[in-house]
Amino acid sequence: MSNANFNRGPAYGLSAEVKNKLAQKYDPQTERQLRVWIEGATGRRIGDNFMDGLKDGVILCELINKLQPGSVQKVNDPVQNWHKLENIGNFLRAIKHYGVKPHDIFEANDLFENTNHTQVQSTLIALASQAKTKGNNVGLGVKYAEKQQRRFQPEKLREGRNIIGLQMGTNKFASQQGMTAYGTRRHLYDPKLGTDQPLDQATISLQMGTNKGASQAGMTAPGTKRQIFEPSLGMERCDTNIIGLQMGSNKGASQQGMTVYGLPRQVYDPKYCDAPGLLGEDGLNHSFYNSQ
């Protein structure tokens, strides 16, 4: 199987732009540090081109076997391309079992087809960090923090629900003492008056304002009949036909002689004409006079 079956052609357009951006993230200084570490761990020289020296997967398999013996049982001689790909695949599976996170691991084509050398470099740095965490003398990468597990009793966990963290803010030593739930009746009163407990629902605290001694005595509910009269005239509550002076005055006029609605009205002037005559049931003309 020839190399032409695995190597891609030149990239154009958006693919070329993405490839150039990935290439710009590649760090030559990190490459030199990786070279020193890998050559020191395996005892083998990589060569002038760093990525070409790792492309067959032989040095990578030897590296993981040094860090964790027996990780790769068989290392293929790089006779054909599929041998190289198999070596790279064995290395990737081995470092995953070693503890490298899956999102830090490159794909085989990233190295074999030279598509993403930056990701290959990141994977080797993650492998160095994992080796340093496990106690190997590696001058590259960072040591991961060890997991610190704590087990608490269920009673302790329930008590923690009553504690408000500082990230929620502070109430400056205030409390909710005396607060009621939503929808509960509120008994308002002024403690300065010496009343320990609220008297009734009509007692309003001073923080609600003051009514200056006024009360709601004599007030009726909406829709109730109102008995209107003028107490300054000495009148008592007689009936609903008496209108108080606050409603205006009719100047002594009365409704005497008024008829109910719908009756006919006989209109005439007694100075100029006699009283109007009406025909009775007997067919005769009868005169009616005003009685004064």
From Swiss-Prot:
Q: Answer whether the UniProt record assigns the keyword Phosphoprotein to this protein.
A: yes
Pfam families named among the record's database cross-references? Calponin (PF00402), CH (PF00307)
Q: Where is this region: Calmodulin-binding?
A: 185-193
Under which name does UniProt file this protein?
Calponin-1
One of the GO biological process terms: actin filament organization
Domain Calponin-homology (CH) stretches: 28-131
Q: Which residues carry this modification: Phosphoserine?
A: S175
Q: What does this protein do?
A: Thin filament-associated protein that is implicated in the regulation and modulation of smooth muscle contraction. It is capable of binding to actin, calmodulin and tropomyosin. The interaction of calponin with actin inhibits the actomyosin Mg-ATPase activity.
Q: Where are the Calponin-like repeats?
A: 164-189, 204-229, 243-268
The UniProt family comment states: Belongs to the calponin family.
The terms describing its cellular component in GO are: actin cytoskeleton
Superkingdom of origin organism: Eukaryota
Q: What positions are modified (Phosphothreonine)?
A: T170, T180, T184, T259
Q: Which gene encodes it?
A: CNN1
A GO molecular function term, named singly, is:
calmodulin binding
Which organism is this protein's natural source? Gallus gallus (Chicken)
Cite the post-translational modification comment.
Phosphorylation by PKC or CaM kinase II reduces the binding of calponin to F-actin and tropomyosin.
Tissue localization of expression is: Smooth muscle, and tissues containing significant amounts of smooth muscle.
Tell me which InterPro entries the record gives: Calponin-like, Calponin/LIMCH1, Calponin_repeat, CH_dom, CH_dom_sf, SM22_calponin
Q: Which UniProt keywords apply?
A: Actin-binding, Calmodulin-binding, Phosphoprotein, Repeat
